[in-house]
Amino acid sequence: MFVKLKKHFTRSDHRGMIGGIRLHTLTRNTSMNNKNVGVVGLGAMGLGIARSLLRSGFNVHACDVRSAVTEQFASEGGVACASPATLAAACDVIVTVVVNAEQTETVLFGDNGAVAALRPGSLIIGCATVAPTFAVDLGERLASHGLLYLDAPISGGAAKAAAGEMTMMTSGPQAAYAAADAVLAGMAGKVYRLGDVHGLGSKVKIINQLLAGVHIAASAEAMALGLREGVDADALYEVITHSAGNSWMFENRVPHILKADYTPLSAVDIFVKDLGLVLDTARASKFPLPLSATAHQMFMQASSAGFGREDDSAVIKIFPGIELPTAKKPSA
C-alpha cells in the first residue's frame, strides 16, 4: 500500500480509497510558513526546490560548493550559508539535494557537516538517488544522533522542481512524515508514501531510473538508426512523438540532439551511476536485467569517450557512421 499526498497542503485525516490506494486529504497549515528550512545543494533540482519553498513562505537557508549560486539565491530572498553546519544551526528541517551517497555522507558527516550542528528531533529529507541499503543504514545512523530521516528521492526534472511540481518517492517513520508534511507540500506536486521502512523510496527511485535510462538509450538508438538511414531528424521526431513508439524521455531528450545542445540538465555520468545502482541491487538478489545492463554499457561507453559531463542525450554520440545535427544559427 502507498499513500499519495497532494501538493501545498499538510496531511490530516484519511478520506477515501482510490483503487485500493489510501489517499490523504490535506489542509494548509499556515503556522508552518515561517519555519526555517535548509537546502543543501543548489544544482538544477536543488535550486528549483529552494525557490519553491521560498514561494511557499518558508525561511530558506541554502548552501552549495559554488558561492555564486548561493549569493544569487540570497538576492532572491533566501539566506546564503557557508557550510552545511552553518545552515543546520539555523534550521529544523534540512533537504539534501546532492548527487550520490558519497556527497550525502560528506554534507552530513564530513568537516562542517550538518549532523553535528542539528538539534535533536530535527529532520533530514534525503533526495539523492542512492542504494536502498545506504538509505537503510543512513536512517539508523541518524536515529542514533536523535534525528529523523525521510528517504525521499525525486523525479521530474529541473522545470518541475522549479514549479514545485516534482514527484517524490518517500519512506520513513510516522514521526518523519509529521515533521515533513508542510515542507513536502511546498516542494512537490506528488508525494508517494511507500512505507515506514527506509529504503523503499530508494528502491522505487532506482526502478524509475531503470526505465529512464533504458528509454534514453533506446531513444538515442532510434534516432541514430534514422540518421544512418537518411531520415530527416526533425521529421522523425515529429512522427514518433505522435505515434505509439513515443516516450516521455524521447520527447524530452531528442530536442537536445536536434539543437546540438548537450548542456547537462542530467549528465551521462548520472546514468552511469544510477544504472550501476540498479544492477548492484539486482545482482544482490541474483536477478537478471539484460536491458539495464546494455543501457549501462552504452552510458559507460559515452563516458569513457569523454562525454560523461554532457547531457545524457549525448549517449547518441557512441554510434558510428552518423552525422549528428549541428547547432542552428539564429535567424537574422
How would you describe each model-predicted region?
Residues 4, 13, 17-28:
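Short, positively charged and aromatic/hydrophobic N-terminal segments
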Residues 25-97, 122, 190:
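NAD(P)+-binding Rossmann beta1-loop-alpha1 motif at the extreme N-terminus of oxidoreductases
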Residues 84-148:
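Rossmann-fold NAD(P) dinucleotide-binding segment
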Residues 129-209:
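Rossmann-fold dinucleotide-binding core
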Residues 163-164, 168-171, 192, 198-229, ...:
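Active-site-proximal catalytic alpha-helix in oxidoreductases
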Residues 202, 211, 246-310:
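Interdomain hinge/lid region at the active-site interface
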Residues 300, 304-332:
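NAD(P)-dependent dehydrogenase/reductase Rossmann-like domain
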